[in-house]
Amino acid sequence: MNINQLILRNLKKNLRNYYLYVFALIFSVALYFAFVTLQYDPAINEVKASIKGAAAIKTASILLVAVVAIFILYANTIFIKRRSKEIGLFQLIGMTKHKIFRILSAENVMLYFGSLAIGVAAGFSISKLVLMILFKIVDVKADAKLHFSEQALVQTVIVFCGIYLLIMIMNYTFIKKQSILSLFKVTSSTEDKVKKISFFQMLIGALGIVLILTGYYVSSELFGGKFKTINELFVAMSFILGSVIIGTFLFYKGSVTFISNIIRKSKGGYLNISEVLSLSSIMFRMKSNALLLTIITTVSALAIGLLSLAYISYYSSEKTAEQNVAADFSFMNEKDAKLFENKLRESNISFVKKATPVLQANVDIANIMDGTPKEMQGDPGNMQLAVVSDKDVKGVDVAAGEAVFSGYTDLLQKIMVFKDSGVIKVKSKHETQPLKYKGLREEFLVSYTFTSGGMPAVIVDDSLFKQLDKDKDPRIQLAQSTFIGVNVKHDDQMEKANELFQQVNKKNEHLSRLDTSAAQKSLFGMVMFIVGFLGLTFLITSGCILYFKQMGESEDEKPSYTILRKLGFTQGDLIKGIRIKQMYNFGIPLVVGLFHSYFAVQSGWFLFGSEVWAPMIMVMVLYTALYSIFGFLSVLYYKKVIKSSL
């Protein structure tokens, strides 16, 4: 057999054994090329958000390269170690290290650049689809065209050639450093030896669980009123991050082994074949991969959490728009409102107009606040709030000497908590009126321009409102003292009405609920698009790494399967244990990552939107379904190994 035949044979073998690596490499190249193509596509700037579309895509492509580079280099480390005995045999038959390096380099050139070429072709073919997905998410009305960019091609080739150069340096360093004897010991030295579990290890296991639970508890109290300053919040967030990450590392280092040992002892040491194959492997292998599993779990939690928060903002855009704009269309002056009404009538669009007089008054709300944040902006004893008459609020009749608050965001409900009752003081220019606070309504009566961005409006008796109007403080009144809202009666006429609104709103001083919702969808749609694809890339790469580790374990355990089958155990007996083992190997990092992301999202979801459960559950279910594919593939590989063991 000559060198060329040897290279081709090894290449064929590698393609058969590491097809998932080739797939992940092709997928990564395709996604990167598609992203870079979008970056240079003129159509991307049709995405009207508060950030430039091309700039966002460029940032995403840099993060994508980082994820892909780490995956490829780590996967290469696994492969070169798995082939250490093969390299040792080459040296035993007289090959020099330089010649062995040339053989490996030739294999990698064909495998790597073949995948690169296929990936670029695939990336070009899906670039239009990716652009269509982006336009759909951000609700942009534009045509997506298939666009080939030479700049994108050059950038992709340069980036992946750089990664390939790093692979070659790693391989050369590995071959140069290893002696023949050490090459035959590489795989056997990578796992911890089976030994009795020490008290120290049990202590580490217990400490890991305590640290994780402590981090969860602090995260649940983050905005509950216990941390009242920015510095306190920063320290608490830093503690949560450190506690959960260190706890996760200790969990894999000791907790899993500790819990598995408790299960084993509870059975008196008598384990069936399924328990032997699952528990034993987890007890003595998982802790050797503690750092890797910690990174995978942490980044999985980060990806799920960020995607959940972005989707919460996207999902809540319409409700957030309803909170910010109290009618379909809100006007700051009567002149433009009249012009808009005339245009609606000319187009036969039915509508209802409502004008609500609004006063600004300083209100002492200190008595009804349940705790006062130390760094709260504004004085609770002199808070500027919008005041409206109960006559202008349908279905509300406020008695003399009483007041009702209406309209309050989820964010303010977490940061500024009101009691159920108490006394507030409404101040006019010369007088102060004490009023009994009678509770909080959800309805937003006026747009955010009247309410300092989301504070509640105060509903008072009409006679008191007239009195306050006569004695109002002119220094705090807004230029517009009347909220003018226009609601379109039929939803199917909303788009047309919004087009007419754009003709009137030339100075962007008025508000459209539809435009406000679209702006939020555009911004967070872009974030969701980027985080979604980055999360998908990480999911595939991390799933592949776990799969490769299982491939290595299955080959190491092959002699054990041979013995077990000779003892009379069937393939079905062994596969049953393997399924349980893979549920642990893939399930534990997934479940821990889901818990991390759940508590992270729960601690601050209200900063991003008004709906939490539906978006979060959808993201978690989708991530779990895709992640489970790798567990299924690893079971199939084990089946093949068990079948060939006898």
Swiss-Prot record:
Induction description: Expression is induced by bacitracin, via the two-component regulatory system BceS/BceR.
Membrane is among the record's keywords: yes
Biological process according to GO: response to antibiotic; transmembrane transport
Keywords noted in UniProt: Antibiotic resistance, Cell membrane, Membrane, Transmembrane, Transmembrane helix, Transport
Pfam family membership, one: FtsX
Chief place where the protein resides: membrane
The keyword Protein biosynthesis is annotated on this UniProt entry: no
Protein known as: Bacitracin export permease protein BceB
UniProt organism field: Bacillus subtilis (strain 168)
